Amino acid sequence: MEPATLITIFLSCFLVGVTGYALYTAFGQPSKELRDPFEEHED
């Protein structure tokens, strides 16, 4: 395979992985540990 193809595949997998991790952190199990600054400072 050409180096450009391998780099493209690697970058694509990396971006999909980062996006998946961000979605898991935002909506998965770890989201229960996230703090909400708006709820902390209700007036």
Swiss-Prot record:
Topological type in the membrane: Single-pass membrane protein
Entry's localization field: Plastid, Chloroplast thylakoid membrane
Principal place of residence: plastid
Alphabetical list of Pfam families matching this protein: PsbN
Origin superkingdom: Eukaryota
GO biological process: photosynthesis
Mitochondrion as UniProt keyword: no
Keywords: Chloroplast, Membrane, Plastid, Thylakoid, Transmembrane, Transmembrane helix
GO CC list: chloroplast thylakoid membrane
Keyword Nucleotidyltransferase: no
TM annotation in the entry: 7-27
Annotated family: Belongs to the PsbN family.
UniProt-listed HAMAP family: PSII_PsbN
Function in brief: May play a role in photosystem I and II biogenesis.
Protein name per Swiss-Prot or TrEMBL: Protein PsbN
